[in-house]
Amino acid sequence: MRQLCRGRVLGISVAIAHGVFSGSLNILLKFLISRYQFSFLTLVQCLTSSTAALSLELLRRLGLIAVPPFGLSLARSFAGVAVLSTLQSSLTLWSLRGLSLPMYVVFKRCLPLVTMLIGVLVLKNGAPSPGVLAAVLITTCGAALAGAGDLTGDPIGYVTGVLAVLVHAAYLVLIQKASADTEHGPLTAQYVIAVSATPLLVICSFASTDSIHAWTFPGWKDPAMVSIFVACILIGCAMNFTTLHCTYINSAVTTSFVGVVKSIATITVGMVAFSDVEPTSLFIAGVVVNTLGSIIYCVAKFLETRRQSNYEDLESQAEGEERQPSGDQLPFVMEELPAKSGNSEPESAEGAGDSVQQGGQESRGSIRGISLAARSSRAEGHSDEVGRRSLKDTYLEVWRLVRGTKYMKKDYLMENEALPSP
């Protein structure tokens, strides 16, 4: 029970940390883009990946983290996740450039529906429960309602926003699939993704001339801007890890819903700090419907978790009883059966007759008598043991039937029932 509570607390803590880091990163990146006109987004992505790769490699060499060394087999296991992670972060940065922060959040609120659909197709783990399905549909309707209040963004921003949602959903589903297919944890996944993506991002940063023209940016003279830039790099590393960890522990849909919950604070900060979206009645109604869908999802997942824990308790209880079928507490102590001596007298008489008939061969008769006596004692002990075992098994079968309502996966009566001869 304590281990179950600890697992739930860890899952909730990781989800909250993911929401905090993700919301903070969105706000800080929007500050860089809107207030300081910082447009070198590929450089931000490259430095985030390289910082994570160098930090994890240093910690691995110092023996502070248990991560296997990078190799081709390890890279092959997370190749799809690494490609989608790089593409998702690029599309997110470009959509933040072309969309207002609240409108970007509205796009991200469609993530649970897309994640659920891709998860059903890829993971093939069955349809979601009615509560989860209702929560996802309500959340998506709220996002569409809120999006109808702002259609003034850049068309490229809308296109990249839609692509970012699709790629992000596929990225989360692929993380969940990798967690089931491989034995590596989220820290190993982040290490492999960072090491694999860093060379490609370095090439892209030079190809886009971000790494060349970024150093002539006048904002480097502002300490606040430099602090925000460094914070974006560090928080980006933390957010990538919490994304992986939350998906490993919980699920892809839960990770996408964390973004829905944290978006309330993001929308509030976006409207107050940037003033690029007026809080229209349609937009506010969409946010309210979105929040209602998030609450329904939390309640549905709580009920599912409690139902699953009850089922696991019943399973463990049944397995515990199945492991010790002969360890039931008997209401009284069974007495041992008395030794049967009916077969010993004829055998001893037979041995005496042999000794009279073979008077001249006393030594041979004595040896034969000893062997017959040993054989009779072994047969006697074997029959005694079989009798005690059959009586005890019969009593235990009757006692299990009398005990009442606990049913086992095996039917011991059917196992020991004698089949009729043909």
Curated annotation (Swiss-Prot):
Biased composition (Polar residues): 355-364
GO molecular function, one term: protein-macromolecule adaptor activity
Localization annotation: Cytoplasmic vesicle, Secretory vesicle, Synaptic vesicle membrane; Early endosome membrane; Endoplasmic reticulum membrane
Organism lineage string: Eukaryota, Metazoa, Chordata, Craniata, Vertebrata
Superkingdom to which the source organism belongs: Eukaryota
UniProt record, GO biological process: energy homeostasis; platelet dense granule organization; positive regulation of autophagy; positive regulation of protein exit from endoplasmic reticulum; protein exit from endoplasmic reticulum; UDP-glucose transmembrane transport
Keyword Endoplasmic reticulum among record annotations: yes
Phenotype seen when the gene is deleted: Mice lacking Slc35d3 display decreased concentrations of serotonin in platelet-dense granules and altered hemostasis. Mice also show a loss of dopaminergic neurons and exhibit metabolic syndrome and lowered energy expenditure.
Family designation: Belongs to the TPT transporter family. SLC35D subfamily.
Transmembrane segments: 9-29, 38-58, 64-84, 103-123, 131-151, 155-175, 187-207, 224-244, 257-277, 280-300
Name the record gives this protein: Solute carrier family 35 member D3
Free-text tissue specificity from the UniProt record: Expressed in brain. Expressed in subsets of dopaminergic neurons. Expressed in maturing megakaryocytes.
UniProt entry keywords in alphabetical sequence: Cytoplasmic vesicle, Endoplasmic reticulum, Endosome, Membrane, Sugar transport, Synapse, Transmembrane, Transmembrane helix, Transport
Notes on how activity is controlled: Inhibited by proton uncouplers that directly abolish the proton electrochemical gradient.
Cellular component, GO, one term: early endosome membrane
Catalytic activity: UDP-alpha-D-glucose(in) = UDP-alpha-D-glucose(out)
Quaternary organization: Could interact with ATG14, BECN1 and PIK3C3 that form the PI3KC3-C1/AIC/autophagy initiation complex; enhancing the formation of the AIC and promoting autophagy.
Gene name linked to the record: Slc35d3
Biological role: Probable UDP-glucose transmembrane transporter involved in UDP-glucose transport from the cytosol to the lumen of synaptic vesicles. It is involved in platelet dense granules maturation. Alternatively, could function as a molecular adapter enhancing the formation of the PI3KC3-C1/AIC/autophagy initiation complex to promote autophagy in dopaminergic neurons. Could also regulate the plasma membrane localization of the D(1A) dopamine receptor/DRD1 and dopamine signaling.
Region spans: Disordered: 339-365
Bilayer topology annotation: Multi-pass membrane protein
